[in-house]
């Protein structure tokens, strides 16, 4: 009888170890995929500029005299101009400049911003740009596949994967969706809707986070005490599956830096007051820049 008990206990340890190994492997793959996405031809490490559009003519080219400054990889000087008024942007390309959109050559085109369906992207050599809309303001976001931060990438930094930072939260739905004021790096706020609150325990103490919905996931913008020393100072992002039977798994081993951790040309949301936690969560992604 005792022998059987020892065998059973041994098997439990083996199963637990195998389960933990499988979990660590899954998180490692997720982290590798996350890095691949950041470094892709359209990833955040290619972002090379952000230029707010002014009413009237906005010139585009390489050099300090232009309103929208392409990188040095465009060697022809003047690229063209954007005539902007009341959210409408008309691009005219200078004579002799080759540019495409949707795989077709262009000389003039209306630029559809990123908040509408089928936004317009302009390609010129290794660079691309498109119009974004944020809080009623419009800007041109520039990307370059030969961007120096991408070419000089030196690896993401992570805490060791620890299963204890994968916690199960209780999801308490609101009677009605609640509007949450989300601040951003532009100094303004915008409204998002939250349908409930997540309650969980860490180190024996209760905490809560207010998520918003993004596609098929919950999106959590949070900040913890590690932001003072080891993680990005403005906070981090965490995605989680939508609740099942009133429960949500929060895997802080997958906590990730916002785009602003890698480029000054992003327009990141910041944690609302409800999501600033008075606890250290040494899990997930660390600061990219020391």
Which residue stretches match the model-derived regions?
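Bacterial N-terminal signal peptides
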Residues: 6-14
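Boundary at the C-terminal end of the N-terminal hydrophobic targeting segment
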Residues: 17-21
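Surface-exposed beta-loop interaction hotspot
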Residues: 123-189
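Forkhead-associated
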Residues: 53-117, 239
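Positively charged n-region of N-terminal signal peptides that target proteins for export
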Residues: 1-4
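C-terminal soluble interaction/assembly domains
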Residues: 229-253, 257-260, 272
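Flexible, glycine-rich surface segments
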Residues: 165-227, 232
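N-terminal beta-hairpin/loop module of FHA
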Residues: 22, 26-74, 225-226
């Amino acid at each position: 009888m005792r022998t059987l008990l020892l065998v059973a206990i041994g098997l439990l340890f083996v199963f637990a170890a195998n389960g933990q190994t499988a979990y660590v492997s899954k998180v490692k793959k997720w982290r590798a995929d996350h890095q691949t996405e950041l470094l892709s031809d359209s990833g955040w490490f290619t972002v090379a500029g952000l230029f707010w559009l002014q009413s009237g003519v906005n010139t585009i080219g390489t050099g300090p005299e232009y309103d929208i400054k392409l990188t040095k990889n465009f060697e022809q000087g003047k690229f063209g101009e954007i005539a902007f008024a009341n959210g409408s942007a008309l691009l005219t390309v200078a004579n002799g400049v080759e540019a495409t959109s949707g795989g077709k050559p262009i000389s003039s085109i209306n630029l559809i911003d990123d908040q509408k369906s089928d936004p317009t992207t302009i390609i010129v050599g290794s660079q691309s740009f498109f119009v974004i809309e944020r809080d009623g303001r419009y800007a041109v976001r520039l990307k370059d596949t030969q961007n120096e931060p991408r070419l000089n990438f030196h690896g993401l930094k992570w805490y060791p994967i620890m299963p204890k930072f994968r916690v199960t939260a209780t999801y308490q739905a609101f009677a009605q969706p609640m509007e949450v004021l989300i601040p951003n790096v532009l100094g303004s706020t915008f409204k998002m809707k939250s349908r409930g609150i997540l309650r969980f325990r860490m180190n024996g103490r209760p905490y809560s986070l207010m998520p918003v919905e993004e596609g098929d996931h919950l999106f959590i913008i949070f900040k913890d005490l590690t932001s003072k020393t080891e993680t990005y100072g403005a906070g981090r992002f965490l995605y989680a599956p939508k609740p099942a039977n009133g429960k949500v798994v929060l895997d802080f081993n997958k906590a990730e830096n916002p785009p602003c951790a890698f480029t000054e040309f992003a327009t990141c949301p910041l944690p609302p007051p409800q999501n600033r936690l008075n606890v250290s969560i040494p899990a997930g992604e660390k600061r990219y820049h020391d």
